Amino acid sequence: VDVLCLDKTGTITEGRMEVSDVISLDGNDHEKALCEMIYALGDNNPTALAVMDRYKKDGFLPEREWSAKTAIHFSSAKKWSLAAFEDKGTYILGAAEFILGDAMTDALREQIKTLSEGGYRVVLFAHSDNMPPEVEGGALPENITPVALVRITDCIRKEAPATLKYFAEQ
């Protein structure tokens, strides 16, 4: 075999996302806010499920306590989701370049690139003290601050290394 082309999702991976790290960018713990955001969204997308599974597995999963004023679900066009809470501000999760735009620093871009090595997907968890503007389809609030990076992996199937080794030897 000279060339082997694979669509990794579901072929060499299980198709099940798993959060490997939540890296604070400001020294604070953001697990409670991240879980409250996922509760408010009520999403069953792979990223949301991976976040909740991480905290269930760690025995941390907090009770839902915050009341969301607004929730905007993830879309592949926007590449982010958000939940706005009374007295807590707005939390946003998604692709850093779509959330921050021109405000994304070179240092953050480099950190995301480094964390992405090895096939990880890295999403930004950000906060704003402001509420999002009320426009159709949803929009981001002003003054967004990156607070954490969430590193996610798609688990490799147990038999994948042996399968790939077989093809390499052919």
At which residue positions do the language-model features occur?
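Cytosolic catalytic regions of ATP/NTP-dependent phosphoryl-transfer enzymes
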Residues: 2-146, 152, 158-170
